[in-house]
UniProtKB/Swiss-Prot annotation:
UniProt-recorded name of the protein: Muscarinic acetylcholine receptor M2
UniProt gene name: CHRM2
Disease in which the protein is involved: Major depressive disorder: A common psychiatric disorder. It is a complex trait characterized by one or more major depressive episodes without a history of manic, mixed, or hypomanic episodes. A major depressive episode is characterized by at least 2 weeks during which there is a new onset or clear worsening of either depressed mood or loss of interest or pleasure in nearly all activities.
Residue numbers carrying Phosphoserine: S232
GO molecular function: arrestin family protein binding; G protein-coupled acetylcholine receptor activity
Factors inducing expression: Up-regulated in response to enterovirus 71 (EV71) infection.
Parts of the chain that traverse the membrane: 23-45, 60-80, 98-119, 140-162, 185-209, 388-410, 419-442
InterPro entries named in the record: GPCR_Rhodpsn, GPCR_Rhodpsn_7TM, Musac_Ach_M2_rcpt, Musac_Ach_rcpt
Side Extracellular, residues: 1-22, 81-97, 163-184, 411-418
Region annotation Disordered: where it falls in the sequence: 218-355
Length: 466
């Protein structure tokens, strides 16, 4: 019994470069990092799935990034830990190549997703009028699919079939590494394409994004808050619709007056005909006003502070006229590129002085929307998204740079890099997948609150968490 125990200890000592307590320590640390990576990225994916406020184009890119990081946490980290503590690759050449292909495809997909996020924000800032038209969920899905397909094409065939291309497998039994990394030209090319070029592009893009954002914030601060137009910059749209006069409601009652205060008015069976179908806005910042006027004189339309008084009249006359004005101010979602939209909809019937009365009501209500705004801080959604991109970019550069520098050095001087340093550099790339979910939570309060609700099993109203 003692002989068999001593034999197993001697075998471990011969194969593993680490002592027993070091192996235990490495397994505990690596296992913990793998677990945190898995939990963190599952939280990101579930949060985007259950919280409608996180279901934005920008966060769909983060969802794809979380998928890549989850695969790294489940497979790559644990297989590399096994390889490290044992001291040799025990699973054979086929599994070795499959692991390397999966590892590099997923890692490159992460880089591609970061590039997409950077380009997306860059176009949002530099082309705010033309890019939002193309920025749809379908387009986001196509870009994400392209990132994964391109990553697969770049890495998987070369890793899996290089031994057949050159006619021999030079990777020795018990070892697992990419065979073509022994070729200096190929190594330089892949390192530049997979790391250095993306980093340069992302850095330049972020510089432009940051400059444009600071310029916009500085411009907003220069304008006096009290004189700011709450609707500007906006796109004001108006359209006139003529309803069927035969459906006009009639009543024996005289002229009634309904006051709309703070954008809300009590509904009754008559006003319902005019205000029904009014567009509902999902954003808390959105406002909508419906004003109904009929058979009114110019002086019957009055305006007070935060109040619109409109006259609603009913007549037995079949030719009675009715005008409905709908104003909606649309505020974009947290990652939206689009400017604020104010829509003025005029619904009325034709008749004597009909157009004139529509114009009167429209002028009065549009004038109301342009009253001086109360003291209101500038929106921080743009700063929030820019800050998230910066955090992800910095985390990527810091964790990936050491390994990619060592890859270039290893091409000319393999003995120059100790195994321990190489292992740490390789693990730093994996740790990037652990850090990313923390970046989302630190830079986005909605992610942070949703994470908290999920971890504490508070599922009530989680879909509306902001």
């Amino acid at each position: 019994m003692n002989n068999s125990t001593n034999s197993s200890n001697n075998s471990l000592a011969l194969t593993s470069p680490y002592k027993t307590f070091e192996v235990v320590f490495i397994v505990l640390v690596a296992g913990s990092l793998s677990l945190v990576t898995i939990i963190g990225n599952i939280l990101v994916m579930v949060s985007i799935k259950v919280n409608r406020h996180l279901q934005t184009v920008n966060n769909y890119f983060l969802f794809s990034l979380a998928c890549a990081d989850l695969i790294i946490g489940v497979f790559s980290m644990n297989l590399y830990t096994l390889y490290t503590v044992i001291g040799y690759w025990p699973l054979g050449p086929v599994v070795c190549d499959l692991w390397l292909a999966l590892d590099y495809v997923v890692s490159n997909a992460s880089v591609m997703n970061l590039l997409i996020i950077s380009f997306d924000r860059y176009f949002c800032v530099t082309k705010p009028l033309t890019y939002p038209v193309k920025r749809t969920t379908k387009m986001a899905g196509m870009m994400i699919a392209a990132a994964w397909v391109l990553s697969f094409i770049l890495w998987a065939p070369a890793i899996l079939f290089w031994q057949f291309i050159v006619g021999v497998r030079t990777v020795e039994d018990g070892e697992c590494y990419i065979q073509f990394f022994s070729n200096a030209a190929v190594t330089f090319g892949t390192a530049i394409a997979a790391f250095y070029l993306p980093v340069i592009i992302m850095t330049v893009l972020y510089w432009h994004i940051s400059r444009a954002s600071k310029s916009r914030i500085k411009k907003d601060k220069k304008e006096p808050v009290a004189n700011q137009d709450p609707v500007s910059p906006s796109l004001v749209q108006g359209r006139i619709v003529k309803p069927n006069n035969n459906n006009m409601p009639s009543s024996d009652d005289g002229l009634e007056h309904n006051k709309i205060q703070n954008g809300k008015a009590p509904r009754d069976p008559v006003t319902e005909n005019c205000v029904q179908g009014e567009e509902k806005e999902s954003s808390n910042d959105s406002t909508s006003v419906s004003a109904v006027a009929s058979n009114m004189r110019d002086d019957e339309i009055t305006q007070d502070e935060n109040t619109v008084s409109t006259s609603l009249g009913h007549s037995k006359d079949e030719n009675s006229k009715q005008t409905c004005i709908r104003i909606g101010t649309k505020t974009p979602k947290s990652d939206s590129c689009t400017p604020t939209n104010t829509t003025v909809e005029v619904v009325g019937s034709s008749g004597q002085n009909g157009d004139e009365k529509q114009n009167i009501v429209a002028r009065k209500i549009v004038k109301m929307t342009k009253q001086p705004a109360k003291k209101k801080p500038p929106p921080s959604r743009e700063k929030k998204v820019t800050r998230t991109i910066l955090a992800i970019l910095l985390a990527f550069i810091i964790t990936w740079a050491p390994y990619n520098v060592m890859v270039l050095i290893n091409t000319f001087c393999a003995p120059c890099i100790p195994n321990t340093v190489w292992t740490i550099g390789y693990w730093l790339c994996y740790i990037n997948s652990t850090i990313n979910p923390a970046c989302y939570a630190l830079c986005n309060a909605t992610f942070k609150k949703t994470f908290k609700h999920l971890l504490m099993c508070h599922y009530k109203n989680i879909g509306a968490t902001r």
